[in-house]
Structure formats: C-alpha cells, structure tokens
C-alpha cells in the first residue's frame, strides 16, 4: 500500500492495521508493505504504535525476524509461522514485544530481494518503507508487485484523485484499491462492488486465465446455440441509371463531370466511349 501525504492519515493507518491483522495476515490480498511519504512518515509511525503495532528498526532485530518469517532458500514464507499471531512470531525470533501487539513492522529501505521482508509473509508482519515522494512511492509499489505479486492487488491512500487514476493505470495489478483496507477490499463486496471471493485472478500479468474475483459464474458451462446467418452484403449504385435506347443524349441535361458508361468492348475499341467524353466535356469516364 502506498500512503501518500494527502491521505486521511488516521483512516489509512487504521485500514492497514485492520487489514493486516485480520485472520493474522493470511488473506493473500493483505498488504505486504506500507510505503509512506517522508513528509508524514514519523506521524504514520506514531499512529501505528498507537494501534499496538511494534516498529522494528535495528538491523540485528530485522535479521532475526527474517530468519523466522522467511525461508530464504526458497524466497518464500516459512510455513511454520503462517497465520500465527504477532506475539508468537516475535517470541520465535527472540524479540520482546508488549502484550496485545497486533503487528510487527520492519523498517526496510526498499522493495527488493536484498530486503526479504518485502516478500509475501502471510502473517501479521509488515514491511515499512519510506518514499521520497510520489514518483519514488510509485516505483517502490511497482517493486513490491514485481516480488511475486504482479497482477494481484495494489492499494493507494490519497485524497488526490489524479494520483488515484495515475496509480491505477501504472500498477500491474488487477485490483487497485483506493482508501481501503487491502484484505477486506481485495476479497470484494465490503468496501466496493467487486465480486466477493477468496480466489482472486491475476490476469495475464500473473499468467492466469482471468483477472477478476472468481465466483460461481466461473464454474458454469455456458452453451451457445449459434444458427447460421449471412452477414449484410451490399453495394452502392448511382441514384439514377439510364438504360433505354439513346439515353446517352440525356447527358446534355445533367450537370455531372463523372459518369459510368456501360458498353461492350467494341464500343471502347472503336472509340465511341472517347467520342462521348469529348462531346459532353466530361473530365472522367468509367468504361465498363
């Protein structure tokens, strides 16, 4: 989720905590990182702490958390901690946290493989990344998607409607949520009009056949009985066609510089078509 400086800060932080703590972070659509503009970074951190979240900043503590949360050999989450509470995970990592801790937030500088906690964690563990502004925030959000989430879900918290549109266009995600908790928003219906589902398509970005939330409709075999029909076939004809004997004399009374003369090849061969053209000062004549 990208948290831009114009957002309603308290709502944005509440949404992220609500989303990431729901079902202990097991919803695949939940945030894996909060990318926060530098202008509001300290204020956002304080708000997270007010929501019983613990900020982990020391490199040694982050390294301990990485070892417990991730299987770095597989660049994937450690299955042993999936769905566990923040307190249980902290204990496994040898970190002391207060009772009632909802989330563990690890401060990392960027969304790259050099910082494994940017990967999908399926737990109440969230990366916290500072951005230098909109462009940097967008790039880091793209980096998050490229770390195994391409085609899935992206979130922006901002009151700037132009940025909402730009973010939606730029992110390679099939669900782009605005000012919403990612887990509850991504699975649909509660915060938007998307189809409620726990199976989310990632489109061609993620090598999926569909890009929407999977529902019972996708399980139906829809038959089509198609009866034969001919497509419309037509051709344009002149508004007037003169065909009786001596009708060529009507050219004296018609204001036209282009006519089509229908005749046999002999009429052309012996020059009669050219004679008509000269006598009536026609600049062009189609001979058929």
Regions found by a protein language model. Name each.
Residues 232-288:
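ATP/NTP phosphate-donor binding region
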Residues 36, 56-58, 104-106, 177-180, ...:
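General beta-strand structural signal in soluble alpha/beta enzymes
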Residues 43-50, 166-170, 271-280:
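Short, aromatic/basic amphipathic alpha-helical patches
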Residues 95-231:
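Conserved C-terminal structural/oligomerization subdomain of aldehyde/semialdehyde dehydrogenase
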Residues 7-11, 35, 39, 43, ...:
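Conserved active-site and cofactor/substrate-binding residues in soluble primary-metabolism enzymes
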Residues 1-112:
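ALDH superfamily catalytic-core signature
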Residues 37-39, 107-109, 157-159, 263-266:
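Structural motif
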């Amino acid at each position: 989720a990208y948290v831009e400086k114009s957002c309603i800060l308290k709502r944005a932080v509440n949404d992220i905590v609500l989303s990431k703590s729901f079902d202990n972070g097991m919803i695949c659509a939940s945030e894996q990182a909060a990318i926060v503009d530098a202008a509001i970074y300290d204020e956002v951190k304080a708000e997270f702490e007010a929501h019983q979240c613990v900020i982990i900043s020391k490199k040694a503590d982050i390294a301990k958390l990485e070892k417990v949360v991730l299987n770095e050999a597989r660049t994937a989450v450690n299955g042993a901690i999936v769905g566990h509470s923040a307190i249980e995970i902290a204990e496994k990592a040898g970190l002391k946290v207060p009772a009632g801790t909802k989330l563990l937030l690890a401060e990392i500088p960027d969304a790259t493989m050099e910082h494994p906690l940017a990967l999908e964690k399926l737990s109440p563990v969230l990366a916290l990344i500072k951005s230098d502004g909109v462009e940097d925030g967008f790039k880091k959000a793209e980096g998050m998607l490229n770390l195994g989430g391409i085609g899935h879900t992206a979130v922006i918290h901002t009151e700037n409607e132009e940025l909402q549109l730009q973010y939606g266009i730029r992110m390679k995600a099939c669900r782009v949520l605005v000012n919403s908790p990612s887990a509850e928003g991504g699975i649909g219906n509660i915060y938007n009009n998307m189809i409620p589902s726990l199976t989310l398509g990632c489109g061609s970005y993620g090598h999926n056949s569909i890009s929407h939330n999977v529902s019972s409709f996708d399980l139906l075999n829809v038959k089509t009985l198609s009866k034969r029909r001919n497509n419309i076939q037509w051709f344009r004809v002149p508004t007037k066609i003169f065909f009786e004997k001596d009708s060529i004399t009507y050219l004296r009374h018609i204001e036209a510089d282009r006519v089509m003369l229908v005749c046999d090849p002999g009429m052309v061969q012996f020059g009669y078509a050219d004679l008509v053209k000269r006598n009536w000062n026609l600049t062009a004549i189609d001979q058929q």
